[in-house]
Amino acid sequence: AGYTMWDGPYGIGGSRKYLISSLDQSLKRLGLDYVDIFYHHCMTPDTELKETALALSDITRQGKAIYVGMSNYNGKKMHRMYHRCDDLNVPFIINQNRYSIFDRTVEKNDLKKEAKSKKKGLIAFSPLAQGQLTDKLAGGIVENSRLYNNEVLQKKVGYSEGRQAQIAQLYKMAKDRGQTLSQLAIEWLLQWGGVTSVLIGVHSKAQLLENLKALECKPLSKSEIMQINAIAGK
């Protein structure tokens, strides 16, 4: 919860009214009494973290959610929210942030380090960088891909000729290891440390099964991890 639900006051962000109304409507649509994890996704500067934490406290005390998680927080904000939740006995257990070989924001803003120090989980979403880390793009953008004829998205995810060269190098590395590029990207996340799980989006059962094979691939060596980081310029 956190993104725009309706026009007008309290239609976005982390206010008590927004978060409680958002979950109530979701539970009604799902036909459920509660959810296992309720995420707060989008912070707004005009809502204090204390108010958001109080709303999450109400939600868990009422039994509408068993646990809560934070998404798109940076390290500093996560640190503050951790203490707010701890003071209110809110079961905050997980963070959900964009993280991939190409996107290291959670390292730069200290979210990953803060989550580890507080012993909170980290779920990585967009692990394939909007489809860039797949065999499909090894030779360049193809029709029916997310990036095809979409300059806005290309700019947003950092796609360029230089990025394409990086993709080609990573693809070759994956092929030499006997795996797909997506498997390499997922394996890197899980082995890099501090990542609890990876959130993947697929269009078919075949894609899901292919990505799950990342769990069966041989572990990356330290030199291979260094090679991946060097290719990505990180």
What annotation goes with each model-predicted range?
Residues 3-20, 41-47:
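Active-site mouth loops of central-metabolism enzymes
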Residues 12-30, 78-82:
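Short, acidic/polar
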Residues 27-46:
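Active-site groove signature of glycoside hydrolases
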Residues 43-233:
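Beta/alpha (TIM)-barrel catalytic core signal, keyed to glycine-rich beta->alpha loops juxtaposed to Asp/Glu
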